[in-house]
Design a protein with these regions (language model features):
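Short S/T/G- and acidic-enriched coil/turn segments that sit immediately N-terminal to beta-strands
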Residues: 156-162
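Beta-strand-rich modules
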Residues: 164-185
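Long, polar/Ser/Thr-enriched low-complexity segments
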Residues: 1-109
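Extracellular low-complexity, O-glycosylation-prone stalks/linkers
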Residues: 130-149
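Extracellular fibronectin type III
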Residues: 181-198
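Conserved aromatic anchor
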Residues: 120-132
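An aromatic-rich alpha-helical recognition segment common to small helix-rich domains
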Residues: 60, 126, 136, 175-176
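Short, solvent-exposed loop/linker segments at the N-terminal edge
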Residues: 114-118
């Protein structure tokens, strides 16, 4: 039953009347909408989508993301101008990857360890269950990393990216990308470091 309130000369209603119309206040306006009863939530498509979401959330929790990785995911979410947290962006990109028939055994790069930057170089090591050689993309802007650096086998972790020819006293942003055999990619968050003064 709807609750009707009548101050001086205005009327407002909220809740549902007769299981058909719903009255509410939305963005400062009194609105009425048809009550929608959700469709069967157990269709094959919905169960598949929920399975993909569950797999993405499970991967987030078992991947062993460090504080540096989590900060990078949040930085990426901020730089992408989406109203998402790093967690939500991770889950979204993983689900999109799986929908594109990506290899579920390929994981996004993680556990990044940024070496001590010199005035013109920096080496980053990371783990990534990648079928193909990962790449790193680096730039001086949060929103544009256009320089591609091919990664090599790492010394202590699985892979490493050696950034050279950098400018002194400059903040760089980079992300890492792992690939499956069909060239579907999984990217990391947006990491950062500042080179030393010359």
């Amino acid at each position: 039953m709807a609750i009707v309130e009548s101050p001086l000369l205005a009327l407002s209603a909220k809740k549902t009347i007769g299981k058909t119309l719903t009255y509410m206040r939305l963005k400062g306006q009194n609105v009425v909408r048809q009550r929608v009863i959700p469709a069967n939530p157990h269709t094959a498509s919905q169960q598949t989508q929920r399975g993909l979401m569950s797999a993405a959330v499970e991967l987030f929790h078992i991947l062993g993301l460090t504080a540096v990785d989590l900060a990078a995911l949040n930085r990426w979410a901020t730089a992408s101008f989406r109203k998402l947290s790093g967690y939500n962006l991770f889950v979204k990109t993983r689900v999109d990857y799986l929908i594109d028939n990506g290899d579920a055994s390929v994981e996004p790069p993680n556990t990044a360890t940024i070496g001590v930057p010199t005035d013109d170089s920096c080496t980053v090591e990371f783990d990534a269950a990648s079928s193909e050689t990962p790449n790193a993309f680096i730039g001086t802007s949060k929103t544009s990393q256009l320089t591609i650096v091919a990664c090599a086998v790492g010394d202590t972790l699985e892979w490493k990216a050696a950034f050279t020819g950098l400018s002194p006293s400059t903040t760089y942003y980079f992300y890492l990308v792992s690939y499956d055999t069909d060239a579907n990619d999984q990217r990391s968050g947006l990491y950062t470091f500042t080179t030393a003064a010359s």
